[in-house]
């Protein structure tokens, strides 16, 4: 039950982040809906296709798809001036969704019978996949390709999650919560103190 509600939370939060970005780019309602939905379900879709574990999650159970659509519509109706929102709103919402989806991705990979390395990779894909699709559609450089500490937070949280469960035998839900908190703390710290990774620069 906890995983279900966390999944709903992550879906809604990522949908909101997609809608807010669409609003900043002055997209029409259809563009808003597309950007919000792909942000919410994109990462999980890539994960399920990679695991080849039957139909993707929103085909088997459209709950996440419905939640994403409803969230998009409500955000579109209630947030009339996204350009006036504080700059930290979108990054913080994205960080929450990121942490939740990394944990869910690791859990689903373990449920599919994978080892810890693949589980970590699936967690990262679940966390960043929707954001990559969102940024590509919005013609922005995906966050994962910038010097922001983004994928790093996913990887470390995924490692903590997988290690706690696979190596130390911690119950899966507890390991998930631990990994999520680590991912969220790292990402929020990076946002708060503008922490970045060094850039790779080649001089001409």
Residue spans of the language-model regions?
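C-terminal ends of transmembrane helices
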Residues: 15-25, 48, 74-87, 132-143, ...
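N-terminal topogenic module of multi-pass integral membrane proteins
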Residues: 1-41, 45-52
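Cytoplasmic-side transmembrane-helix entry/capping segments in multi-pass membrane proteins
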Residues: 30-38, 61-65, 86-97, 122, ...
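Structural signature of hydrophobic alpha-helical transmembrane segments
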Residues: 1-11, 56-70, 115-127
């Amino acid at each position: 039950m906890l995983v279900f509600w966390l999944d709903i939370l992550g879906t809604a939060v990522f949908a909101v982040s997609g809608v807010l970005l669409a609003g900043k780019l002055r997209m029409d309602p259809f563009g808003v809906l597309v950007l919000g939905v792909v942000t919410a379900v994109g990462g999980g879709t890539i994960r399920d296709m990679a695991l080849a574990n039957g139909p993707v999650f929103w085909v088997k159970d459209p709950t996440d798809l419905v939640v994403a659509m409803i969230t998009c519509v409500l955000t579109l109706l209630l947030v009339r001036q996204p350009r006036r929102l504080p700059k930290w709103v979108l990054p913080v919402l994205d960080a929450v969704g990121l942490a939740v989806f990394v944990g869910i991705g690791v859990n689903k990979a373990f449920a599919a019978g994978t080892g810890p390395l693949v589980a970590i990779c699936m967690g990262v894909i679940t966390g960043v996949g929707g954001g990559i699709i969102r940024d590509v559609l919005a013609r922005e450089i995906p966050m994962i390709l910038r010097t922001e500490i983004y994928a790093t937070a996913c990887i470390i949280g995924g490692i903590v999650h997988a290690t706690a469960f696979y190596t130390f035998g911690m119950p899966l839900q507890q390991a998930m919560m631990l990994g999520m908190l680590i991912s969220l703390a790292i990402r929020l710290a990076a946002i708060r103190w503008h922490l970045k990774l060094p850039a790779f620069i080649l001089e001409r």
